[in-house]
């Protein structure tokens, strides 16, 4: 399954030329600077979709929150075939997400794992509010499945460290 980088076209990000995790991270950070400045690289998506139809060779996996304000591929100015992206509320992973990360590293051979956090995370806010108000997660959200995420986050919250929440 580990295909040679030369088996796939170079994308605008230049990520496939990176040979080690530090180079991949540097290129992702360059892409983030382009995103922040509004000078994204051009992407020929049709060509990239066609050229990756028979295989892929991502160089990183990014674990991020599901927050719609943090579109991973755009945040790092990457394109089709550059990265794997795993998204879950609050970056709290379970066995299936961990299995995907293992696949990316062990089978596909990605060179870097990135855990991308962000400000004003709704899941983190809900977990903090539950701890501060002394609610259990189902009471805090009135959701059926979200508590499984909040229950993993709550023990990590030190109520004494919270200021003016």
Residue spans for each PLM region:
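Divalent-metal-activated hydrolytic enzyme cores
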Residues: 1-55, 81, 90-111, 122-165
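Divalent metal-coordination and catalytic microenvironments
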Residues: 28, 62, 86, 115
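Short, intrinsically disordered/low-complexity patches at protein termini
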Residues: 60-61, 109
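Active-site cofactor/substrate anionic-group-binding motifs, chiefly glycine-
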Residues: 63-100
